[in-house]
Amino acid sequence: MPKSGLKCPVSSFFLLILYSVKTENMKILILNGPNLNLLGIREKSIYGETSFEEYLSGLRDFYTMVEIDYYQSNVEGELINKIHEVGFSYDGIILNAGAYTHTSIAIADAISAIPCPVIEVHISNTAKRETFRHVSFLTPVCR
Protein backbone atom coordinates (compact mmCIF):
# COMPACT_ATOMS: atom_id res chain seq x y z
CA MET A 1 0.00 0.00 0.00
CA PRO A 2 1.44 3.41 -0.90
CA LYS A 3 2.49 5.63 2.01
CA SER A 4 -0.30 8.06 1.19
CA GLY A 5 -2.78 5.45 2.40
CA LEU A 6 -4.59 5.38 -0.94
CA LYS A 7 -5.98 2.06 -2.02
CA CYS A 8 -4.18 1.66 -5.31
CA PRO A 9 -5.53 -0.70 -7.98
CA VAL A 10 -2.09 -1.39 -9.41
CA SER A 11 0.01 -1.72 -6.24
CA SER A 12 -0.33 -5.51 -5.98
CA PHE A 13 0.65 -5.82 -9.64
CA PHE A 14 3.72 -3.71 -8.92
CA LEU A 15 4.73 -6.18 -6.23
CA LEU A 16 4.32 -9.03 -8.69
CA ILE A 17 6.61 -7.35 -11.21
CA LEU A 18 9.13 -6.29 -8.59
CA TYR A 19 9.59 -9.76 -7.17
CA SER A 20 9.47 -11.64 -10.46
CA VAL A 21 11.94 -9.52 -12.45
CA LYS A 22 14.36 -7.48 -10.33
CA THR A 23 14.17 -4.93 -7.54
CA GLU A 24 16.68 -2.19 -8.33
CA ASN A 25 16.86 0.28 -11.18
CA MET A 26 13.60 -0.96 -12.66
CA LYS A 27 11.83 1.08 -15.29
CA ILE A 28 8.07 0.56 -15.48
CA LEU A 29 5.44 2.23 -17.64
CA ILE A 30 1.89 2.59 -16.45
CA LEU A 31 -0.15 2.90 -19.64
CA ASN A 32 -3.77 4.00 -19.41
CA GLY A 33 -6.27 4.04 -22.24
CA PRO A 34 -9.44 5.94 -23.05
CA ASN A 35 -11.34 7.89 -20.42
CA LEU A 36 -8.88 7.06 -17.66
CA ASN A 37 -7.83 10.72 -17.68
CA LEU A 38 -11.21 11.29 -16.00
CA LEU A 39 -10.56 9.14 -12.91
CA GLY A 40 -11.88 10.86 -9.83
CA ILE A 41 -14.60 12.72 -11.72
CA ARG A 42 -16.12 10.08 -14.00
CA GLU A 43 -18.67 7.54 -12.75
CA LYS A 44 -17.48 7.70 -9.16
CA SER A 45 -19.68 4.77 -8.15
CA ILE A 46 -17.63 2.54 -10.46
CA TYR A 47 -14.17 4.15 -10.50
CA GLY A 48 -14.03 6.00 -7.17
CA GLU A 49 -13.11 9.57 -6.32
CA THR A 50 -9.32 9.34 -6.50
CA SER A 51 -7.57 10.83 -9.51
CA PHE A 52 -4.87 8.82 -11.22
CA GLU A 53 -2.37 11.54 -10.34
CA GLU A 54 -3.05 10.74 -6.66
CA TYR A 55 -2.53 7.01 -7.26
CA LEU A 56 0.66 7.72 -9.20
CA SER A 57 2.05 9.97 -6.50
CA GLY A 58 1.43 7.25 -3.91
CA LEU A 59 3.14 4.63 -6.06
CA ARG A 60 6.17 6.82 -6.65
CA ASP A 61 6.42 7.59 -2.92
CA PHE A 62 6.22 3.91 -1.99
CA TYR A 63 8.31 2.34 -4.78
CA THR A 64 11.26 4.73 -4.64
CA MET A 65 13.64 2.16 -6.18
CA VAL A 66 11.54 1.99 -9.36
CA GLU A 67 11.41 4.57 -12.13
CA ILE A 68 7.70 4.86 -12.87
CA ASP A 69 6.70 6.53 -16.11
CA TYR A 70 3.09 7.25 -16.95
CA TYR A 71 1.28 7.75 -20.22
CA GLN A 72 -2.42 8.07 -20.98
CA SER A 73 -4.17 8.45 -24.31
CA ASN A 74 -7.68 8.21 -25.63
CA VAL A 75 -6.27 7.30 -29.06
CA GLU A 76 -5.60 3.64 -29.93
CA GLY A 77 -2.69 4.37 -32.27
CA GLU A 78 -0.92 6.48 -29.65
CA LEU A 79 -1.15 3.59 -27.16
CA ILE A 80 0.32 1.24 -29.77
CA ASN A 81 3.13 3.70 -30.52
CA LYS A 82 3.97 3.91 -26.81
CA ILE A 83 4.02 0.10 -26.48
CA HIS A 84 6.44 -0.05 -29.42
CA GLU A 85 8.54 2.79 -28.00
CA VAL A 86 9.12 1.24 -24.56
CA GLY A 87 8.57 -2.45 -25.23
CA PHE A 88 12.21 -3.17 -26.01
CA SER A 89 13.82 -1.18 -23.19
CA TYR A 90 11.53 -1.17 -20.12
CA ASP A 91 11.27 -3.86 -17.45
CA GLY A 92 7.49 -3.96 -17.54
CA ILE A 93 4.27 -2.30 -18.64
CA ILE A 94 1.16 -2.13 -16.50
CA LEU A 95 -1.68 -1.62 -18.96
CA ASN A 96 -5.25 -0.54 -18.41
CA ALA A 97 -6.47 -0.26 -21.99
CA GLY A 98 -9.97 0.73 -20.89
CA ALA A 99 -12.61 -0.13 -23.47
CA TYR A 100 -9.89 -1.07 -25.98
CA THR A 101 -9.42 -4.21 -23.87
CA HIS A 102 -12.59 -5.59 -25.42
CA THR A 103 -12.08 -4.42 -29.00
CA SER A 104 -8.44 -3.98 -29.98
CA ILE A 105 -6.68 -6.70 -31.87
CA ALA A 106 -4.14 -4.03 -32.84
CA ILE A 107 -3.11 -3.46 -29.20
CA ALA A 108 -2.93 -7.23 -28.69
CA ASP A 109 -0.65 -7.48 -31.72
CA ALA A 110 1.56 -4.67 -30.36
CA ILE A 111 1.93 -6.52 -27.05
CA SER A 112 2.79 -9.74 -28.90
CA ALA A 113 5.50 -7.91 -30.85
CA ILE A 114 7.57 -6.83 -27.83
CA PRO A 115 9.69 -8.79 -25.32
CA CYS A 116 8.71 -6.60 -22.34
CA PRO A 117 6.27 -8.21 -19.86
CA VAL A 118 2.82 -6.60 -19.90
CA ILE A 119 0.26 -6.94 -17.13
CA GLU A 120 -3.38 -6.10 -17.81
CA VAL A 121 -5.22 -4.34 -15.00
CA HIS A 122 -8.65 -2.78 -14.52
CA ILE A 123 -10.04 -0.56 -11.81
CA SER A 124 -13.51 -2.09 -11.92
CA ASN A 125 -14.41 -5.77 -11.92
CA THR A 126 -15.13 -6.26 -15.62
CA ALA A 127 -16.62 -9.72 -14.97
CA LYS A 128 -19.42 -8.09 -12.98
CA ARG A 129 -20.22 -5.43 -15.55
CA GLU A 130 -21.87 -5.50 -18.97
CA THR A 131 -21.50 -8.73 -20.95
CA PHE A 132 -19.36 -7.11 -23.65
CA ARG A 133 -16.77 -6.29 -20.97
CA HIS A 134 -16.30 -9.98 -20.11
CA VAL A 135 -14.07 -10.58 -23.15
CA SER A 136 -10.48 -9.34 -23.30
CA PHE A 137 -8.42 -9.46 -26.47
CA LEU A 138 -5.37 -8.58 -24.34
CA THR A 139 -5.39 -11.26 -21.63
CA PRO A 140 -4.09 -14.03 -23.94
CA VAL A 141 -1.01 -11.99 -24.94
CA CYS A 142 -0.15 -10.39 -21.61
CA ARG A 143 2.65 -11.98 -19.60
Place the predicted regions along the sequence by residue.
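Glycine- and acidic-residue-enriched helix-capping/strand-helix junction motifs
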Residues: L38-E53
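Short Gly/Thr/Asp-enriched flexible loops that form oxyanion-binding sites at enzyme active sites
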Residues: S104-P115
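Short, acidic/small-residue loops that bind anionic groups at enzyme active sites
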Residues: A113-R129
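Short, glycine-/small-residue-rich phosphate/pyrophosphate-handling segment
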Residues: K128-R143
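Short acidic/histidine-rich motifs immediately flanking catalytic phosphotransfer sites
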Residues: V86-I93
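Short beta->alpha junction loops
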Residues: D69-G77
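Extreme N-terminal starter segment of soluble prokaryotic enzymes
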Residues: N25-I28
